[in-house]
């Protein structure tokens, strides 16, 4: 035995011992949960059978492979299908308890009833899941930091801002000039991304990127896509970040920061100069009204400001454009739905397209809701338990008993499965049918923008912009045809987008 040990490299022994200690520290708390007392009335949740019962590495490896192969949505559906007798279950995820659910009442508890008991910082800041892309921001912070981040942006998502379609109109006018003539096949997804980049860059920075005219200026979109893909993967695997090579993600971050830094630095310099002139009693010009300027007045520090801007600009630059692309993906495959939309739009003639007009278009809103339902942008809602808490459902073999959740546990509500649950939506849950929304009331079973205090502040703005663009297209074109050869496959960023694009053709007659 002594001779054998003597032949081993001592540093490797130390490394092996350290790794074993780390893995055991992850595994032992998970196994000891069954021996700790639980709250009165609570029952343990069902658990998924796993090959790696000790360290729980089979789930993150399987999940990571699904993300790389662009079949993450299918992976989630298969995972839930493997537990047909319950809507809530858990897995050992790298030695940690990860609770999956499609129960609306659990979503309500996490987002509203027990809001203070759940957070995102343990996932996105500790360990550094989103670093060096961003640290503190409205979607990475809890408590006072979150409240401050929300205060930075809240004025720009008030009713007086989101109800205006005047901001959207010139960009939509320009967008329509880039659509090919009748019957020509084109991919509308990247064009929508450039349209939205131009509009959001003016809204946030006060100056449009004008990438519709100059496509080369849209390169930052593809870097942002890689950043979003990486943040999604890191949010899902934040307990085992060490297991992956992140070089590609860091390179994408450098490109995005390189795009944002000139805007931020020039804004801070302009702000300092303006404040100095005011101090000296010198005249100043009209103050800027863009979001970055407003944020800089409250947070005049470059790195902290960049973190806040990254969290707002990068994820949101993908959301609206991809959502509209998904709406058109379905409409191109359902000509009756396009016909009904066009009838609703043409019924108002040439009336100005206002927020109130869009809100009253029932079929248009049914189309948007049905698209949110079938391809939700937020596929999962993930929170970390900040304290011990009892959820109203999830325990027992059928998931109907209360469930004891411990500090550090992860609760993940799978919206892409919940929104197709036949118990809630009927036997046609997988079918595209905008008519189902006629008279349907909302609730915790359908929250495309989240709920509770952390509900997306841009909800009405996204709906207004998306509805406006769909209305303009329906007013202009009599028909839309699908020209995709491939079935839909989701490529994950923060949310899913079509791996093969959205290839369509429009006809005016």
Curated annotation (Swiss-Prot):
Pfam families: p450. It is a single-pass membrane protein. Keywords: Glycoprotein, Heme, Iron, Membrane, Metal-binding, Monooxygenase, Oxidoreductase, Transmembrane, Transmembrane helix. The keyword Plastid does not apply. Disulfide bonds: none annotated. InterPro entries: Cyt_P450, Cyt_P450_E_CYP52_ascomycetes, Cyt_P450_E_CYP52_fungi, Cyt_P450_sf. Its cofactor is heme. Glycans are attached at residues 317, 369, 378, 464. The chain crosses the membrane at residues 5-27. Pathway: Secondary metabolite biosynthesis. Belongs to the cytochrome P450 family. This is Cytochrome P450 monooxygenase fumoA. It comes from Cordyceps fumosorosea (strain ARSEF 2679). The gene is fumoA.
């Amino acid at each position: 035995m002594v001779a054998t040990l003597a032949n081993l490299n001592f540093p490797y022994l130390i490394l092996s011992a350290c790794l074993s200690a780390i893995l055991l520290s992850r595994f032992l708390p998970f196994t000891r949960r069954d021996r700790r007392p639980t709250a009165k009335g609570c029952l343990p949740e069902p658990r998924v059978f796993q090959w790696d019962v000790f360290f729980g590495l089979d789930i993150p490896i399987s999940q990571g492979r699904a993300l790389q192969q662009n079949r993450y949505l299918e992976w989630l559906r298969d995972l839930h299908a493997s537990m047909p007798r319950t809507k809530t279950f858990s897995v050992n995820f790298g030695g940690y308890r990860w609770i999956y659910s499609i129960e609306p009442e659990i979503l309500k508890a996490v987002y509203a009833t027990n809001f203070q008991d759940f957070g995102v910082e343990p996932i996105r800041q500790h360990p550094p899941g989103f670093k060096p892309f961003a640290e503190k921001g409205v979607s990475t912070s809890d408590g006072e930091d979150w409240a401050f981040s929300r205060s930075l942006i809240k004025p720009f998502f008030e009713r007086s801002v989101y109800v205006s379609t005047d901001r959207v109109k010139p960009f939509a006018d320009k967008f329509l000039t880039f659509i090919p003539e009748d019957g020509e096949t084109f991919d509308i997804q990247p064009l929508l991304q450039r349209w939205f980049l131009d509009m959001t860059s003016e809204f946030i920075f006060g100056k449009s990127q004008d990438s519709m005219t100059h496509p080369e200026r849209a390169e930052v979109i593809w870097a942002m896509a890689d950043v979003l893909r990486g943040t999604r993967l890191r949010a899902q695997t934040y307990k085992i970040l060490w297991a992956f090579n992140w070089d590609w993600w860091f390179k994408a971050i450098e490109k995005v920061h390189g795009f944002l830094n000139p805007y931020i630095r020039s804004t801070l310099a302009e702000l300092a100069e303006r404040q100095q002139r005011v101090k000296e009693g010198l005249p100043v010009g009209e103050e800027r009204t863009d979001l970055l300027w407003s944020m800089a007045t409250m947070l005049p520090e470059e790195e902290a400001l960049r973190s806040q801007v990254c969290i707002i600009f990068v994820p949101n630059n993908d959301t609206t454009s991809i959502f509209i692309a998904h709406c058109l993906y379905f409409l191109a495959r359902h000509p009756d739905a396009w016909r009904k939309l066009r009838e609703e739009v043409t019924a108002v003639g040439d009336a100005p397209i206002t927020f109130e007009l869009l809100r009253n278009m029932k079929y248009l809103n049914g189309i948007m809701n049905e698209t949110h339902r079938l391809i939700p942008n937020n596929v999962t809602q993930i929170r970390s338990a900040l304290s011990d808490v009892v959820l109203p459902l999830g325990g027992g073999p059928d998931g109907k008993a209360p469930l004891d959740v411990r500090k550090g546990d992860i609760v993940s509500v799978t919206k892409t499965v919940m929104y197709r649950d036949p118990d809630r939506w009927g036997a046609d849950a997988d079918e595209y049918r905008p008519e189902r929304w006629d008279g349907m009331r909302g609730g915790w079973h359908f929250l495309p923008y989240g709920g509770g205090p952390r509900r997306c502040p841009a909800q009405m703005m996204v709906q207004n912009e998306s509805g406006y663009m769909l209305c303009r297209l329906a007013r202009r074109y009599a028909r839309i045809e699908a020209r995709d050869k491939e079935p839909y496959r989701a490529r994950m960023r923060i949310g899913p987008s079509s791996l093969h694009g959205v290839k369509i053709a429009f006809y005016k007659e």
